[in-house]
Amino acid sequence: GGLSVALFEPRQVGGTCLNRGCVPTKALLHGAGPGCDWPALAAEVERVVSTLRAGQEKQLRAAGVELIPYRAVVTGPHTVEAGGAAYEAAHILVAAGSEPALPPIPGLDTPGVVTSDGLLSDLRPLDRLAIIGGGVIGVELACVWAAAGARVTILEAAPRLLPTLE
């Protein structure tokens, strides 16, 4: 047999892309438009994400991966603690995922300023939207709200949008 594997995930299996990035934005792009039904669109996004997440969880369990719904803390060269329990391992791989980065701009703590995670967790029509960051998620979110009729401005420090793409 192979190695035994445990996956510590305090949020949701699938990470940023599945839960708060690529997948929800693609589902939004598919359904957004003038006069779109935002509650129905939000329900469809959740249905798509939940279905794919359940599929990932099923695949992981079928492969023998133990899913542990806690944040892990490495406490030694071969020890991880999570949820009040200690786990021993010959090898520890840290794949910490990502969070939206906040640039050092005064005023980002003002009410109404949200990260992409916040925007995706509160889907609703907007008249105007300023997006700081012209990466993939920023551009996709801009397209969603523009398609729904919002006036959208993207602010990007690089000379062009999508600066990490060729």
Q: Which residues are covered by each model-predicted region?
A:
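Rossmann-like dinucleotide-binding cores of NAD(P)H-dependent redox enzymes
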Residues: R47-R53, E57, L120-S121, L126-A130, ...
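Conserved N-terminal glycine-rich FAD pyrophosphate-binding loop of Rossmann-like flavoproteins
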Residues: R11-A32, R160-E166
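Alpha-helical scaffold segments in soluble metabolic enzymes
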Residues: A27-H30, E44, H91, V144, ...
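FAD-binding core/adjacent interface of flavoenzyme oxidoreductases
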Residues: A6, V13-V23, S50-I132
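Glycine-rich active-site loop/strand segments that organize a redox cofactor
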Residues: T25-R47
